[in-house]
């Protein structure tokens, strides 16, 4: 492919388009906390908007914010950032944001789900753009505090002001994203690749492969503790090597026996059939069928999600991990 992605870094971006703007961060969970703290530490004016007093409210207060009810945060805001769960955004928009929309306001997303699948259809006189961190919220905060940043994707859906991209990049900079890089994309590309990635590898694929390998060893009579270190705990070290030095760096660090077994057996486990299933999963996202299924599941109170969490919490691998926590923590590097 000849296309080269447009990537922006700190030197291409300025915070100016966000200076003096009143920013409402709706939600104070995984991303909400990271965004509110990073944006505030970057000198921007942030108010946290929440539905009710509770855990998030207390956490925001403990972090030095004075949270407001969602609509009160929105009424005052120039920029509204949606960091409540994807499935909650439609209702929050309809009941707490739409009634207070003014021409020239900005609606900002960290994932394109609600715009791409048309659950939220804003009027044409506001800007709609996205800054999507390519990493979990607590890491977005941790990297920022340590002087780094998690890469982000930026995209513009509506550009009423003519300045939407500059504003997206200003937020990306304040979040720490442009310390690494901000890649320009579309809502469609971000939404589909993010869902495909988390389902097939980041969350679904990795979790199920680790679980399947662990359970296979245990079924064969090996000790759960040995199976846990082999199939779950050591994966971090292997992935860290890939992160730091690429696949070749990882391969240099493991034995020739592991390399040979890896090249031959890996392809038998992750084979054509697995690739066919990956394509099937990706098509289900692209066709909108996954979104339809998730909205329907949410409408029934998310029973499959609750069951998954309950089963994982009780699983032998999770219990074994908890039992080994002390050993794992003792071994963790101290600096
Ligand atoms: N979690 C991540 O690391 C991550 C990464 C990239 C993008 N995103 C995107 O960021 C957005 C926020 O996701 P998150 O995982 O940080 O959310 P989350 O589940 O951590 O959000 C929790 C927050 O939303 C509030 N909340 C929960 N249910 C609510 C409801 N029904 N109505 C109103 N508020 C409610 C909670 O009080 C809490 O403050 C989503 O669009 C998600 O796709 C998340
Ligand atoms: C952190 C992830 C998996 O990358 C994000 O996309 C999410 O939905 O939580
Ligand atoms: Mg996601
Ligand atoms: Mg993601």
From Swiss-Prot:
- Detail which positions bind NADP(+): 28-31, 52, 56, 86-89, 137
Q: What is its EC number?
A: 1.1.1.383
Q: Per its UniProt entry, which superkingdom is the organism in?
A: Archaea
Task: Mark out the compositionally biased spans (Basic and acidic residues).
Answer: 308-335
Extract the Pfam families matched here. Answer: KARI_C (PF01450), KARI_N (PF07991)
Binding sites annotated in the UniProt record for substrate: 255
Which cofactor(s) does the record list? Mg(2+)
Q: Which residues form a coiled coil?
A: none
Limits of the KARI C-terminal knotted domain = 186-331
Question: Which PROSITE patterns does the record match to this protein?
Answer: KARI_C, KARI_N
Which reaction is this enzyme known to catalyze?
(2R)-2,3-dihydroxy-3-methylbutanoate + NAD(+) = (2S)-2-acetolactate + NADH + H(+); (2R)-2,3-dihydroxy-3-methylbutanoate + NADP(+) = (2S)-2-acetolactate + NADPH + H(+)
Which sites bind Mg(2+) 2?
194, 230, 234
* Keyword Amino-acid biosynthesis among UniProt keywords: yes
Q: Pathway of this protein?
A: Amino-acid biosynthesis; L-isoleucine biosynthesis; L-isoleucine from 2-oxobutanoate: step 2/4; Amino-acid biosynthesis; L-valine biosynthesis; L-valine from pyruvate: step 2/4
Which parts of the sequence belong to the KARI N-terminal Rossmann domain? 5-185
Q: Which residues bind Mg(2+) 1?
A: 194, 198
Can you quote the record's cofactor note? Answer: Binds 2 magnesium ions per subunit.
Spell out the catalytic residues.
111
User: Region (Disordered) spans which residues?
Assistant: 301-335
Q: Which family does it belong to?
A: Belongs to the ketol-acid reductoisomerase family.
Which HAMAP family does this entry report, sorted A to Z?
IlvC
This chain's function reads: Involved in the biosynthesis of branched-chain amino acids (BCAA). Catalyzes an alkyl-migration followed by a ketol-acid reduction of (S)-2-acetolactate (S2AL) to yield (R)-2,3-dihydroxy-isovalerate. In the isomerase reaction, S2AL is rearranged via a Mg-dependent methyl migration to produce 3-hydroxy-3-methyl-2-ketobutyrate (HMKB). In the reductase reaction, this 2-ketoacid undergoes a metal-dependent reduction by NADPH or NADH to yield (R)-2,3-dihydroxy-isovalerate.
What is the protein name for this chain? Ketol-acid reductoisomerase (NAD(P)(+))
User: Gene of origin?
Assistant: ilvC
């Amino acid at each position: 492919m000849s296309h080269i992605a447009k990537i922006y870094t700190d030197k291409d971006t300025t915070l100016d388009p966000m200076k003096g703007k009143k920013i409402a961060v709706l939600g104070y969970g995984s991303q909400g906390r990271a965004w509110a703290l990073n944006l505030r530490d970057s000198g921007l004016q942030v108010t946290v908007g929440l539905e009710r007093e509770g855990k998030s409210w207390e956490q925001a207060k403990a972090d030095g914010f004075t949270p407001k009810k969602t609509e009160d945060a929105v009424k005052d805001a120039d920029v509204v950032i949606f960091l409540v769960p994807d499935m909650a955004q439609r209702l929050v928009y309809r009941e707490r944001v739409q009634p207070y929309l003014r021409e020239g306001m900005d609606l900002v997303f960290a994932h394109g789900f609600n715009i791409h699948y048309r659950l939220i259809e804003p009027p044409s006189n506001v800007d709609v753009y996205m800054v999507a961190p390519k990493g979990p919220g607590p890491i977005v905060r941790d990297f920022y505090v340590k002087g780094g940043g998690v890469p982000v994707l930026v995209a513009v859906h509506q550009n009423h002001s003519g300045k939407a991209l500059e504003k997206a990049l200003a937020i990306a900079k304040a979040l720490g994203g442009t310390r690494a890089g901000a890649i320009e994309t579309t809502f469609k590309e971000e939404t589909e690749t993010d869902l495909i990635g988390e389902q097939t590898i980041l969350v679904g694929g990795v979790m199920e492969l680790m679980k399947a390998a662990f359970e296979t060893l245990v079924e064969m009579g090996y000790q759960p503790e040995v199976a846990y270190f082999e199939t779950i705990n050591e994966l971090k070290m292997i992935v860290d090597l890939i992160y730091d030095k690429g696949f070749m760096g990882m391969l240099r660090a493991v034995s020739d026996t592991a390399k040979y077994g890896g090249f031959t057996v890996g392809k038998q486990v992750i084979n054509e059939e697995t690739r066919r299933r990956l394509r099937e999963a990706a098509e289900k996202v692209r066709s909108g069928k996954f979104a339809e299924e998730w909205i329907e599941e949410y409408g029934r109170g998310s029973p499959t999600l609750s069951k998954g969490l309950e089963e994982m919490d009780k699983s032998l691998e999770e219990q074994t991990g908890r039992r080994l926590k002390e050993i794992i923590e003792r071994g963790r590097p101290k600096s």
